[in-house]
Design a protein with these regions (language model features):
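Terminal accessory carbohydrate-recognition/targeting modules of carbohydrate-active enzymes
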Residues: 22-28, 32, 43, 371-434, ...
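Aromatic-lined, polymer-binding surfaces characteristic
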Residues: 33, 39-41, 47-48, 54-62, ...
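A short, hydrophobic C-terminal helix/tail in secreted or cell-surface proteins
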Residues: 600-604
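CBM-like, beta-strand-rich accessory domains located in the C-terminal region of large
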Residues: 21, 320-328, 420-599
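Carbohydrate-active enzyme catalytic cores, enriched for enzymes
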Residues: 200, 241-409, 470-475, 479-481, ...
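Bacterial N-terminal signal peptides that target proteins for export
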Residues: 1-6
Length: 604
């Protein structure tokens, strides 16, 4: 233990030395210094005049800003243990209004932004017990304070500055747990605090430097999650959240201090943009593993990555979304960032990516094959490994998403709203083997496209690795080692899942039993209608397409159709979906193979 403490102290000292080398506080830019520095408006105006899709985004921000003018001020209303929705509302309003003022110079926007800042500054606190709420609120006030600095009267500046310091910077103890976290909490909380420190730097330089240096010391923990090759352990949904704030953090360092102190160079971070691109299937839906919702949304942070890496192919999908008049945006409260990041980028000749395979290791290994980038009918296979102990994870090792000819045949039900569970007393964050989290239908293994042995939960203290990748024309897929997931009941479990030359799905499970026989339950969640049509066969039908599932196994197989009706009063309904699959008993002390393959159903 003493050696560990000494090592940490040495690392801390070394990091502070590096920080001193990287950061020259004498170079801090004048206000406005966060994201869009003085005169940066002209580049934004040029880009929105050049590209109609960006002009639509600009007009959207102005229209929503006009709507904000007649709405009531944000109030301190808690939702369970969170103030987060209020922080996000304040952030959206202040960011939009400040942008509108800088682009139009119409004082109505600056005045209302000022009133919003004064309103939340008067809150007794910003709910530091759930520090994400503080992180987003500090970000909101820091942008308003910085962007409207010349507009604000000195008395108002003082009120807002004091709120940033007392309810933001001072609320973060040096030993806050999020400083040690490798999750989105690190990026969000560090990001908000960094903005606060940079915004009020002149008035509290010593305090601001401590916040900045603590950020540079602890933020690499969050960046380590992207290694080694860009996969994000928490899935696309929290990539959108955590990475948005990570980008904001880096961009603020660059705009205010002229350096990101090497943060963007951490292994895997920049590569994660390609991970995110592959998370979107040809249908426009996502590979929504872990706590994630589905849908089609433009992610504005991709424009930062494209600019940083000089790779416009990262915008192939995002640019298409922008052309949609009804486009929605991930983390839309940050929408002005899109126009800031698009400045000095030529969006007129974006080409599709040239790659069709993605694979990452790390905490949550993922494999994806995408048949193309130009058609909704391109095939798509996405498979994951990992552990239930990862932040926001489900019991879904070995699960997959499968699309073909425009149909998503195998789906993930996604997350359930946190408040709907917490308000009923469910301890959603207990990830122990008997934790209540796994009693939620959508989060357990029985609601995912994977195996269940003897009707038991997956072992939480397990890790499913991807051991082999197949990239040939007739075998595009992966081998996942599930042995540790079922270590209490099986000697070995390996899943090989791939698409053949016709892009039919083949799932081959190798299962080696121990001293006792084992009941194997094979499940696939689908939005299709299903019927058992014969021995070892199920037919799926959706949108005029039909697909046949055929099973071979060493013993008798019982084909199964399961309803996705809620099993507990706290479970949300799952309309338009069901589960299909089979059950079979495997004898003791034997190596067994269960094979499921798809094919086009014959016409009746």
């Amino acid at each position: 233990r003493l050696q560990r403490i000494i090592l940490l102290l040495v690392l801390a000292f070394y990091s502070l030395v590096l920080c001193a080398q990287f950061v020259d506080y004498e170079r801090i830019t004048p206000h406005p210094r966060l994201l869009l520095t003085q005169g940066g408006e002209e580049a934004v105006k040029k880009s929105i005049a050049t590209f109609p899709s960006l002009l639509k985004v600009h007009k959207r921000i102005l229209e929503e800003s006009d709507e904000i003018l007649i709405q009531q001020m944000a109030e301190r209303v808690m939702e369970g243990k969170r103030l987060l929705s209020v922080s996000r509302l304040a952030l959206k309003r202040i960011f939009y209004l400040s942008y509108a003022y800088r682009m139009t110079k119409e004082e109505k926007y600056a005045y209302r932004a000022t009133q919003e800042m004064l309103s939340v500054s008067r809150f007794p606190d910003w709910n530091p017990s759930h520090f994400l709420d503080v992180g987003e609120m500090v970000l909101a006030l820091s942008i308003g304070y910085d962007w409207l600095y010349e507009y604000l009267e000195s008395e108002i500046r003082s009120i807002v500055r004091d709120a940033i310091v007392e309810k933001g910077l001072d609320a973060a103890a040096p030993d806050e747990w999020f400083y040690r976290a490798a999750s989105n909490w690190n990026s969000v909380c560090n990001g908000g605090l960094l903005y606060g420190a940079l915004a009020v730097f002149e008035d509290v330089p010593d305090k601001a430097k401590k916040i900045i240096e603590r950020c540079l010391l602890t933020n690499p923990k969050a960046l380590s999650a992207y290694g080694p090759d860009g996969g994000y352990p928490e899935g696309f949904h929290y990539w959108g959240y955590g990475t948005s704030f990570q980008v904001l953090l880096i961009a603020a360092l660059e705009s205010a201090l002229g350096t990101d102190a090497g943060l963007s160079e951490y292994p895997g971070f920049l590569k994660s943009a390609r991970f995110m691109e592959f998370m979107t299937a040809p249908s426009g839906e996502y590979f929504n593993f872990s706590d994630a919702v589905n849908g089609v949304r433009c992610n504005m942070m991709m424009f930062w990555f494209a600019k940083k890496m000089g790779d416009l192919s990262l915008l192939w999908l995002e640019n298409q979304y922008l052309e949609n008049p009804s486009v929605s945006f991930a983390e839309d409260r940050l929408l002005p960032c899109l126009l800031i990041f698009c400045a000095h980028q030529d969006l007129s000749n974006i080409q599709p990516p040239s790659c069709h395979f993605w694979h990452n290791g790390g905490k949550t290994p993922v494999f994806i094959y995408r048949g193309g980038w130009n058609s909704k009918e391109d095939s798509y296979l996405a498979v994951k490994g990992g552990s239930p102990l990862t932040s926001h994870a489900h019991m879904d090792a070995g699960s997959f998403i499968y699309e073909r000819e425009g149909i998503r045949w195998a789906i993930d039900l996604g997350m359930q709203n946190y408040l709907s569970l917490e308000s009923r007393g469910i301890n959603l964050w207990d990830q122990s083997q008997e934790g209540q989290r796994w009693g939620v239908f959508r989060l357990g293994n029985m609601a995912h496209n994977t195996l269940t042995i003897n009707n038991k939960r997956h072992l939480v203290n397990s890790y499913a690795s991807i051991n082999r990748i197949y990239k040939s024309e007739d075998k595009k897929g992966v081998e996942v080692d599930l042995t540790s997931v079922f270590a209490d009941d099986m000697e070995k479990v390996v899943r090989i899942i791939y698409l053949n030359e016709e892009d039919d799905l083949i799932v081959k499970d190798e299962l080696v039993t121990g001293e006792k026989e084992a009941l194997v339950t094979w499940i696939m969640v689908t939005p299709a209608e299903a019927r058992i049509v014969g021995r070892n066969q199920i037919e799926l039908a959706k949108d005029g397409h039909r697909m046949l599932l055929t099973v071979t196994a060493p013993g008798d197989v019982e084909m199964k159709l399961w309803s996705n009706e809620p099993t507990h009063v706290f479970d949300e309904p799952n309309p338009g979906s069901m589960r299909v699959g089979f059950e079979t008993y495997l004898p003791a002390n034997r190596r067994n193979f269960c094979l499921l393959y798809t094919s086009d159903a014959a016409d009746e």
